[in-house]
Amino acid sequence: MYPKSVIEQVVKSQRERLNKTDKGMWRKISGFERLSTHAFIVSGVRRCGKSTVLQQIDTASKEPSIYLNFEDPRLAGFDLSDFNRLQEIAEEAGINRYFFDEIQEIEGWESFIRFRLDENYRIFISGSNARILSKELGSKLTG
């Protein structure tokens, strides 16, 4: 369980780093803006460019968002209850878009995503293991 101030610092530093990062070869990605009640999920094997796609969508959207990469060692131990503090940060900033990279690292993440989708949040996630590639994921996100 992390204090809100620690989560805020990680969010801020990851955003600063993201803004400076080379986004690689830009891909033409369309259709995701129509997914108002669904999560946009980028999945695949490790090192295939999922994070780059997520970063490009975030940059191209130009809307305020929270981008969080869960492979950040500062987030080791992040758990479901920490999403509540992250949500407070989003609400205080008037943000309703999340970009979560390697979210499969967090146990129970599906319930947070499902709840936010029900509240019309825009959710973009990436992941690379069997858990995020599972056929059961759809039912976990839709109830």
Feature locations, PLM:
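Phosphate-binding site recognition
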Residues: 1-143
